[in-house]
Every structure is written in structure tokens, then in C-alpha cells.
Curated annotation (Swiss-Prot):
InterPro entries: ARM-type_fold (IPR016024), Hamartin (IPR007483). It comes from Rattus norvegicus. The gene is Tsc1. This is Hamartin. It is found in: Lysosome membrane; Cytoplasm, Cytosol. Residues 295-316, 512-530, 1066-1083 have a biased composition (Polar residues). Residues 295-337, 353-594, 1008-1163 are annotated as: Disordered. The lineage of its organism: Eukaryota, Metazoa, Chordata, Craniata, Vertebrata.
Amino acid sequence: MAQLANIGELLSMLDSSTLGVRDDVTTIFKESLNSERGPMLVNTLVDYYLETNSQPVLHILTTLQEPHDKHLLDKMNEYVGKAATRLSILSLLGHVVRLQPSWKHKLSQAPLLPSLLKCLKMDTDVVVLTTGVLVLITMLPMIPQSGKQHLLDFFDIFGRLSSWCLKKPGHVTEVYLVHLHASVYALFHRLYGMYPCNFVSFLRSHYSMKENVETFEEVVKPMMEHVRIHPELVTGSKDHELDPRRWKTLETHDVVIECAKISLDPTEASYEDGDAVSHQLSACFPHRSADVTTSSYVDTQNSYGGATSTPSSTSRLMLFSTPGQLPQSLSSLSTRPLPEPLQASLWSPSAVCGMTTPPTSPGNVPADLSHPYSKAFGTTTGGKGTPSGTPATSPPPAPPCPQDDCAHGPASQASATPPRKEERADSSRPYLPRQQDVPSDRGLEDLPGSKGSVTLRNLPDFLGDLASEEDSIEKDKEEAAISKELSEITTAEADPVAPRGGFDSPFYRDSLSGSQRKTHSAASGTQGFSVNPEPLHSSLDKHGPDTPKQAFTPIDPPSGSADASPAGDRDRQTSLETSILTPSPCKIPPQRGVSFGSGQLPPYDHLFEVALPKTACHFVSKKTEELLKKAKGNPEEDCVPSTSPMEVLDRLLEQGAGAHSKELSRLSLPSKSVDWTHFGGSPPSDEIRTLRDQLLLLHNQLLYERFKRQQHALRNRRLLRKVIRAAALEEHNAAMKDQLKLQEKDIQMWKVSLQKEQARYSQLQQQRDTMVTQLHSQIRQLQHDREEFYNQSQELQTKLEDCRSMIAELRVELKKANSKVCHTELLLSQVSQKLSNSESVQQQMEFLNRQLLVLGEVNELYLEQLQSKHPDTTKEVEMMKTAYRKELEKNRSHLLQQNQRLDASQRRVLELESLLAKKDHLLLEQKKYLEDVKSQASGQLLAAESRYEAQRKITRVLELEILDLYGRLEKDGRLQKLEEDRAEAAEAAEERLDCCTDGCSDSLLGHNEEAAGHNGETRTSRPGGTRASCGGRVTGGSSSSSSELSTPEKPPNQRFSSRWEPTMGEPSSSIPTTVGSLPSSKSFLGMKTRELFRNKSESQCDEDGMTMSSFSETLKTELGKDSAGMENKTPPSLDAPHPSSPSSDSMGQLHIMDYNETHHEHS
């Protein structure tokens, strides 16, 4: 971050003249970009580049990696919307896209693409439009799947810009329109190559409207004449073109090559995999390579690489040949005479038939009539030396020709263009080292036609040197190594390869000859006939009559002699002006294709007889004769075909260069670099701006052409790998053949050894036969012995079967005996079990008899005690009244306590309701536990309500029981005797009630704490424990209004010694005293208790029931022992307060019972 603090200083150091400082600062910026993820540094670099146009900053921006790609695209999207920075940012986008970054697939989803399309739809600046169209054309092969979203936008842009080329808005300079037309032509090629069905459908729908018909006729239709019928138009569909699966297997250079394959333009089409042009085409133009450096136009064409050319209208083409425009250029070029054969062309039947695409001829041309294009020019097919259609090469040199046909050889060799570092060396073209660039350039400046002029050849070389200065030496070494490898792999012979239709057909010559004728005319015009062309014409005239059947003959007689008339010169000047801008199809050079190794010219009609049917050949011959007659009748009338926009642009640059050099040669200025206009003064501002814009457009066009050249070079490297693999496979096949021969020798040796083995086998066979006869005799003897042994074994087998049957019978008898023994053992065990059961029953009967005798004695003792007493009823009634009063008070207090408990229960209900509300609030946050918590809360509420209802029912039962007891005591007349006992019992009950109240509160508090500790689960103590804390409870529930009093539980030291005082003093006729145990889970009170504490689990209730049952059995046994020991004791007095034994006043019968019996009585 400390380095980013002084970004301004670092940016200023980027433009330092010291390479070390520049490299260090660049490294710092790259490291900062790798560590910094924010957009600040990228935005600063973009702003600085827009201000200074710094090349180091451009290098950093074009090598950005993820995630800074999003920041760069967003920043460029922001500046595209501003008119002031739109051109600069489009140039930056072009630089970034041409390097094909790793994140190029994100361009289809970035907002920059819609902004670019909107700019191309809305902007009116031609420079911006041309730059944007070239950037879009470069991007389309990288993001072909974007056509599914923006296809209509691409078509709208094409329709808008194509109409501009015709309507010519008033504020647009004519020179700009030439560049725009060339870029629109390139866009046409790209859209037609990638989306032919949709594009043709758009053209059909868009240009069927009346207002667009003129645009179609003048602009679009000439473009369509230079493309083939796309195969997708036959086999594909609109949806298939937009299917992303179509582009998955294609890389960027594959898409570019596929688009180039459908072009008929020789500078745009791709020649590979059999796309060869007949050597006759190269023989027709023997001076193309010789004159390649004498014209500024030719090198511009080479710098463009695969610059395509489309037809244009005649009116627009003739604009440049009118005397009012560029007169000096035309006059300077027209004053130089040209040989007649270089102005001629071929007649094309497509122009007459109205066909936009000439039909391709079948690829069945014999091998002796055509040669591979690459090998015909001395290059290797598929090797590093690229075909002429690729941008990586300049026009190839001419094939070997006779000495008189190579008149321009010495001059052309002296001024040959040195190959640039992008060019690929081949075996037939000498490789000039880089040190020869300066002398060659100086030699060019000495030529008459280029004296004092700045040729356009130096511009792409200079730009290429700036762009790739660092890796130039490595590329030179790589090219030399590849050239050496190619020379080792491939042979020098030109193997015959069947050419593909289209390039070998006669119609292809029409599209190719225009640019080549232009090249010859411009080259010869620039040289100014420095070499006498008469040997060439004499040779052409000499070879002319040798042709037996000429389908196309020249219209004008050969010219170029020194004694030509002035009228003839004027005619040649006029024809030259026409041929420069609009090459004529009605003229053809008299020379024909020269086959390699011979001077004979093969007849042209032989190609038609092979490539086309007889009817087509007859048709072409007939048309040729008609044209010849028409040309002889009116030789001045020439058919003017369309010229491609790229050719117009090239000729404009050529003529501008010629006019510039001519005007500078006329001016007598001391320094031509200072004052360079026609008038010798400073140029006007608008002219400077126009020239700068034109230079920028040319630079953008060169960058686009360099991109295409790089894609072709990448393709060529892939083809080189294929050639290497093919050579390796050939070597592998040769090795396999050698192995096959060795294996054949081995087979012969194995055959000889096989014969030897067969002879040996026959000997062994004879030996085997003798051995077999001996063995047969031994076998017969052994068979006889075997039969004897077999008879003996049969006898033994019968004896064995008899023994087995006897054993089976014995086993059956043994099983029967075992079954009888088992049955006897079972009966014995049953008898012994019955005996043990009878003994236990007998012991129980003896125990019960003893207990019956003891109980009878106890009963007699109690009867004697009752008979010996003399009760005083008056005193007893008073005491009973007092006791009942106290008991009434106690019941009232008990009722008060019950009310308090009811209030507590209500408060508990309120607490539970509040707890339920809290639970409901909690349930909103915990959706997973909604049902469980809701059921628990509702269960708690129901338990509290059921407890309350049960408590009320118990209270009512107790009141009824009290009233019933009062009624019984009054009937029996024992109220007076029981008053004293009641008073004492009331006091004891009050004490116990106090203790019970304290214990209840403690137990209730403990229960609440336990319930709160288990997340709302209510846990109750055992029913027995509840009774122990709450004191004794009187329970009654019989249908016959009979009541039973239960003994309350006490702490363990007093649990079995308590008594109920009022009942102990009853007479013998009263209800027997009941000593009760805790209720079980199936008794009446047990069910009530379970209703009070419903939230307790069933398993706990069952366990409690089992514990209470065992406890009741223990209580019965202990009380039985106590009753047995009471016979020898004197009963205590009534006033004795100790509750450990029954009172002496109690005369009733002692009854041991359980709550289970009460439950059965109620049921």
C-alpha cells in the first residue's frame, strides 16, 4: 500500500526513457494488481492512458487478469457513454480484445457489449463508427454465442452503416466513407460467415422494402458477388446457427478461417486442405512478385494481409477517375504507358446470368492440369509458409519463366521488399536478414516513381517493430528453425492435388485478376518503364498464335512499341484510368498458364472440358465469340464490374502517395518536412485533423489486418503440427513395412521348420500306432479281470443291502422304545409337580387355620371387653358434640385451606397461561418444535383444570362423608361418650393440620421448581408422598352410603402407630375399623390421583402402583402381628394421647383391607 500512495510518481516514471526504471515500475504495478482487488488502481491507469496515451500503461491494461477484468470493463463502459473519450476507449478496447485475454468469454455478458452496440447504432462520427465496427468484428469470433442475444443489433448496425455508404451524409468526408465502406464489407463477411441463415433472412426482409432497394443494389449486392453459397444455407437452420454447441469445438482462429473460406476474394479467402489454385493463374501474372516493392499500393495490400475486396457501384468508382478529383494523381499515372495484356480480364458468366455467387466447379481436374497452390509457388502445403490468402504473407513470387518473360527481373530483385518478422519463410524464396532493411529502403527511395515519397510499406513495419520489439529475435530464430524443419520434411516435387471447386474454376480468375491487374498497372506506372517491356510483348505475341483454341482473346491489339501514335497513347491513358479503378472483364492477356518445366502453354478449353459439362463449355465459347465481335465493333465500350471497397481504399492511398511525391518534387522548398502542402505554407487545421483521423483509421485497419494475420499464423502453426504428424506417421508406416518384411522372413523360416516338424510327427505317429496295438491287447486282458471283479462286487453288494435293511428295522424299534421312555418321564414330572402343589396347599391350609384360631380368640377377647364396660351415654354425647364441633371447625379450616389451594391452583393456572403465552412466542422462533411444545402446554393446562375439578369433587365427598358420620353417631347414641375423644382428636388434628400445611407448601414449592427445571413438564410426587405431606384424608364413595375411614400416613417412625380416635371407641355394632394402604394405580383414588397429575408418565404411575401394592402387603402383615400380640395387653384409657396402639375404648372388629377392595366395592 505504501507503493500505491505515490501513484502519480510511478505513472510518470512509466514513461521514463530508461528501460530498467520502466520495467521496475511495470513490475510494481503488476504486483500491486495481483495483491489489490479493488478497482482504484485500474481506474487510475485507464484515466492516465486516456490523458497521455502511454504505451507502458497500455501494455499493463492489456495484460490484466481476473478479477480486474470486471473493473476494466466497467470503466470502459463508463467512458463509452461519453463522446469525448469514446474514440480513445474504443481503441483501448481493440488493443485488449486483439490480445485475446483469458477472460474474453466474459465479454458477451459484460455491459460493455450493449454499450458498444448502442454507440454503433446512435453515433454519427465516422472515425468512431469505423473503429467500433472493427472492434466488433474482432470480438465476434471470440464470443460467437453472443449472437443469440444481440444478433438483431448486429444486423441493425450493418443496415445502418451500409446505408451511410450510399447516402453520404453532408458532414462526412469522402475519404472517411472509403474506410467505413471497407469496415462494413468486413462486417458483411463476418456476419455471413458466422450466421448465414439469419443474415440472409435479414437481408431478404430488410432490403425488400422500397426505401432500401437502392442500398441493396449499390452496396450489398456487390458484396454478395464475392462470397460463395454458405453450406449452412443448405444444411443448417436459424436455430442451429445460434446453438452454443456449434461453437464449443471451434476456437477463435477456427471461426476466422471458416469465415474466410466462403470468400471468393483472393485477398480474403483461405487456401488450405486442397483449396489450391491452378498454376496457370500464377503464370498469367509473371511480374507480380517482381514489381511488389516498386508500388506503395502493393505493400499496403500486403500490410493489410487478408484485406478483402467487395464490389462497389460504378458511379462511386468513377468518382476517383473524374478530372475534378485527384487530377494530378491520375495524370501522373496515366502518362506512363502499360502493356496491353496487363489490362485484360476474363469474362464471367455470373455477371450476365445475374448470379451473386459463381458456381463452384467439381474437384475432378486431372493432376497434370493443376498443381497445389502452395507448391506451385514454391511453398509447402500446410507448412509454416502460409498461402497467399493468409495475412501472414506477401504475394508469392512468380513461377519459373523463360528468359524473355523475366525482363523486369533485375530491377525487381534489386528493390525486393525484405520480409517482415511476421512473414513465414519458405524454401523457394530467399530469406533476407533484418540488417538489409535499411539498404533496401534507401534503394527504394532512389527509384523514379518513389523519389521523395513516404511509402506505406514502412508504416506497418514501423508499427510492427514497436509492438513486438522485444520478441523479434526469438521469432526470427523460430522462423528459421521451422523453415529448416519444413525443408527436411517436405519434398521439392509438386505433388498433384485435386483442387477444390471455386478457386480452380474459370470464374475465380475474374475475382482474382482485378487486384492483380491493379498491381501490375500500379507497379509499372511507378517504375516509369525503367526497363524496356518490348521483350515481354514479343514473347507474348510469340506465344499467342500457338494456342489452338482460345476461348478468350484480347480485344485490343498488343501495344507498347516506341512509335505508337498520340491517339493510341490517349486511348491507353483512358483505358489505364479505367483499369486502375474499374478493371474491365472484356480484356484478357494473350499469354496462358505456363506449366512448370516446359514452355508450352496448355489450352484453356481443356480445363473447361474437365471442370464443366460440354453444355457449359459450349455456352462459354459462344459468349466469348459474342464478346469478341462486340469488342471489335465498339472497342471503346467496356463492361465495368464492381470493385471491392478495400480495393478502392488501397487505390486511394496509392494515388495519395503518388500525388504527394509529385507535388514535393515540383516544389522548390528548402525543407520538405516543414512545408509540405501544395502552396508551400502551413496546413490548415481542418486538413490536419482530417489527415490525423485518416491516419487513425488506417492504423485501426492495419491493427485489424494484423489480428487476422495472427489468426492465420496460429492456424498455420496448427497445420504445421499436422504436417509433422503426417511425416511421423509416414515414417511409422515405413518402419511398419520393414517390420512386415522381417515378419515375412520369419514366416518362411517357420514354414521350413514346420515341414521338419511334420516329418518328425509322421515318425512319432508310426511309433504311436505300434504302442496302441500293444496297449489294446493289455486293455482286453484287464477288461476280462474287471468283469470277474465286478461279479464278486455284485455278490458283496447284495449282502450289504441285507445288512442295511436289518439295521433299519433295529433303528425303528429303538425309536419306539425312546418315545415310550420320554412319555414315562413326562408323566413322572407331572405327578411330582402335583405332589409339590398339594404339599404347598396343605401348608397354606394349616397357616390359615392357625390364623383363624388366633382371630377367633381375639374376637372373643374383644367381645368380653365390650360386655364388661358400662357406657355413660350422656357424657359420651357431650363429648361427641364437642368433638364434632371441633371437627366442624377443623373441616371449615380445611375448607379454607382447600379454597386457598383453589386460589393457588388458579394462580398456577394463570402462571401456566402466561407460560403458555411465552411458549407461543417462543414457538414463532422455533418452528421445528411447534407441535411438541404446544401439546405440553395444553397438557399442563388440562392437568391444572382436572386437578381443580378433582379437588372440588373430593371436597364435596368429604362433606357428604362428614354429614353421614354425624347421622350415624346420632342414631347409635354415642355422641356423649365421644366428645372428650373428639376434643383430643381435634387438638391432634389441628396439630397435624399445621404440620400438613407446612409440608404441603414445601412440597408444592418443590414441585414447581421441579416442573420449571424440565422445560414446562409437570412432575408430581408419588400419591403416597402427597398424602403423607398433606395429612389424612377421609374418603368415601360407596353407592350404599357406607363409608370407610383410611388411616393417614405419617413419617416412618409413626406410620403404623397412628389411630383415628373417634372410631376406636365405638361399640361392637359399629363399622369395623379399617387400616388402609396406599391406593394402587387401578383403584378409585388411584385413578383420581392420576387425573390430578396427568402429565406424569404411565410408566412412573405403574411403578408407583407396584410399590404401593408391596407396601400394603407389608402393612397387612405388620398389623396382623400387632393384633396377635394385643390379647395379653390391657387396653389403654381413652385419654391416652399416644397413638402407637389401638385405644382400649375401641371395641370394633379389626379389619385389614386395601384400596383395591374399595375400588372393587365401588365398581
